[in-house]
Each structure stands twice: as C-alpha cells, then as structure tokens.
UniProtKB/Swiss-Prot annotation:
This is GTPase Der. Associates with the 50S ribosomal subunit. GO terms for molecular function: GTP binding; ribosome binding. Residues 3-166, 175-348 form the EngA-type G domain. Belongs to the TRAFAC class TrmE-Era-EngA-EngB-Septin-like GTPase superfamily. EngA (Der) GTPase family. GO terms for biological process: ribosome biogenesis. Keywords: GTP-binding, Nucleotide-binding, Repeat, Ribosome biogenesis. GTP 1 binds at residues 9-16, 56-60, 118-121. Coiled coil: none annotated. InterPro entries: G_ENGA (IPR031166), GTP-bd (IPR006073), GTPase_Der (IPR016484), KH_dom-like (IPR032859), KH_dom-like_a/b (IPR015946), P-loop_NTPase (IPR027417), Small_GTP-bd (IPR005225). It comes from the Bacteria. Gene3D superfamilies: 3.30.300.20, P-loop containing nucleotide triphosphate hydrolases. It comes from Legionella pneumophila (strain Lens).
Amino acid sequence: MIPVIALVGRPNVGKSTLFNRITKTQDALVADFPGLTRDRQYGHAQHENKSFIIVDTGGIGVDDIEVDTLMSKQSQVALNEANVILFLVDGRSGLTGIDQQIAQALRKLNKKVHLVVNKTDGINEDIACADFQSLGITDIHAISASHGGGISSLLEEILEPFITEMHEATDDKAIKIAFAGRPNVGKSTLINRILGEERVVVYDMPGTTRDSISIPFTREDKQYVLIDTAGVRRKSRIDEKIEKFSVIKTLQAIKEAHVCLLLLDANEGITDQDMNLLGFIIESGKALVIAVNKWDGLEEEHKEKIKSELSRRLHFANFAKIRFISALHGSGVGGLFKDINEAYHSAIQSFSTPKLTRLLQDISAKHTPPCINGRRIKLRYAHLGGHNPPVIVIHGNQLDALPESYKRYLNNEFIKHLGLVGTPLKIEFKGGQNPFANKKNKLSQRQVNKKKRLMRWAKNKK
C-alpha cells in the first residue's frame, strides 16, 4: 500500500510551505498544462523513487475553537487514513498551549507521530528542539521548510518502514485498474456489470466510509484486479472540509494501479472534484481511460453540450480515450477493456535508443529549437528512461533555457509518432557537462621550471 503522510499543526507553523516543498521534489510531467487543476491539500510526491501521498490537514486552533472539535471534523478523516503523522511546530515561537492540546489529541489516535520543529535555520537546533521535549514524542526532527534543510533525512526516516512493502506490491503480474470518480457516479455498478454478478454492495449512506475493494478478475485469459474506491458518501449537510479528504482512498488506489478509469456523470457534467482527481492521475503518471456514465436517455442537445465541455476542459488529457457508457444497462461497457489494454501496453512499451534519437532529430529538424544568446539549443540524442509512464531522456546543450512551449511540442510529437494512446509521456532533459569545468590547469614540473626561468629573466632585464 502506498503510504499516506498527514501534516498537522496550528496555523502559520509552515505546513503549506513544507507541503509545497515536498510535492515539488517529484519530477513533474513536461510542464504545467494550462487548465490542469491541482488540489493543494493533498498531493502525490516522490523521494528517491519512493512514492507516497501527502495531506495538509489545515490549521488547527483558529479563533479559539476547541481543538478536539476541529480534530474530529476537519482533520480526523485524514489522520485516521494516514500511516504517519508529521506534527509541525514553530522552533522560533517555542511551545504553545495549542501545541500541547494537539499533542494530547494525537496520542488518542495511536498512530506513528514525528514531531517536526520548523524554522530552525539560523538558530541552535538542539535548543529549539529541547523546548518541545515535554510533549513526550520521541521522534523529533529539526527542519527549515522554506530553505529545504533537514527535509531529505526526515523523508528517508519516515519512508524506511514502507520500502519492503512497496517493492512487494510491484511483483503482481495482473493489470490493476482503479475505478476513480466522485461518490454515486456509478463505480460499483460498473464493476458489477463487468463481473456479471453483485460482487460489490451498492448503497448510499451519508458519512459512511468504506475501504477500497480489490477484486481479481480474468477476461480472455488475461488477469486483472478491479479496485473500487467508494470513499465517503456525502450529503449536502456533511462538512465541506471533511469531503476534501474523502478521496484519500481513491488516491491510494490510483498510486497502486497500472491503469486508472475515471468515471464521470453525464447528468452533472465535469465538476471541480472531477478535475482534481484527473489532475492527480496525470501527476501520478498513470495510464488513463475516461468513461462518461449515465449516457443513455440523454437528449441529443445535452449530449452535444457534454462533448463540447469535455473537449474544452480536458484538452490537456487528449491522450486518453473517452467512452460514453451506461453502467446500469451495459451499453458501451464492452469496449472499455480494449481501451484499458491499449493504454496499459502503451505505458509499458519499450523503444530503442537509435529509434528515439532518429525521431528526436526528425522532430527538431521540423521545428528547430530557439537560439539563446546567439547560440542554438542543441538536442543531441534520446533514450528510454522508464515505463508507466514512458520516460524519454533527452541529452543536449543549454536545455535549461528550453521554453515550455517547445517542451510541449516535443511531448506532443513523441506521443504522435510513437503511437502512444492512453498514457502521458514524461520527458527529462539532461544537459551536457564540460569535463574541464572547475578544473585548474596543472603544469608539469618541466613547465614550472621554465616559468621560473622566464620570471627571473624578466626581473633581471629590468
């Protein structure tokens, strides 16, 4: 299981700064696609090839509201789902009454808690940490979220217990499909339609949380695992802040899966929550199929409106196949596995270095890179750097100055010429290094003696 790390603490201790610092450590896709929505309260991150999900639970103790009440409403869902809790405090302000109340509330959860003393740059770390010893938390880390100090060692320690578990999870040969979508969009109904039996209980109870359900499934001699992520069933009266964290189970399933099937509701169109889920799937680099459910019975005018909205709002996900289905009646469901298999095989496909290099040369010849300070950016060669998603590593000169628009051009051209369907493509750029950079020219002994003779001769001549 992909670990979930929750950030908790009173306001202004640096949770959002730490969240941004950690989520930026991942190698993002080629660029920030226009229109791509990223929810800033939960994110996918990676540290030294170890993936995890991080959740910012927000500030606790605002306006003197009782801490236990806030913990039970805003943060309890996220903290209960978390494998590790990072309790942030301010090393400059020292221990406060709210910090003590939060520590007391965290003890009741029986979770692994790390105390993270932030803002220790420029001050004595030992003295800053000593002020918080009375909280009784044994694992204490001094960091600077704004400057990045201490974060790498913090992540190494908290992720260490999950390394074996993460490696074991990659050994399964079955294709894992995560059914992602908002509550009541029809995920369980679709899985039941695929299985041909009522394997998943379909119900709607406000505030009810269910774990993800993994169901082994064989179709045409291929093995699959269908992952249903029911999450929290919400009604309008449920606190909106709680609803924010109802997707944590879905995020874990997305990280575990090979292919994500994002289910949309044709009656409601594309919502902000749909866009957040889609953004997380793309940032995770997973193969993607989009299914628009409840398509039957809609008037033609409404269908055209939905298609127009899909084209306008999902243009950055144009690599994904879109299929219009009815999970209840079965129309369009049969073609989903064709799209899923196509996306999976694109995601794991291999390409030789000569093929990628020739393609890079053809693409750059068609539209040459720009000149920087009178020198043209050179793209020398390309090779495959990974799978699911496919990673292409491009080597050259002055690649740091390559415009984002040209990176998008390369991305689109590679997807088109390689015939990739249903998977994002990740491109990494590595600049050529001068082997003589930062190296001082060392004279031989003969050259040193000659230099001394010349200096003596010049001195005597004066």
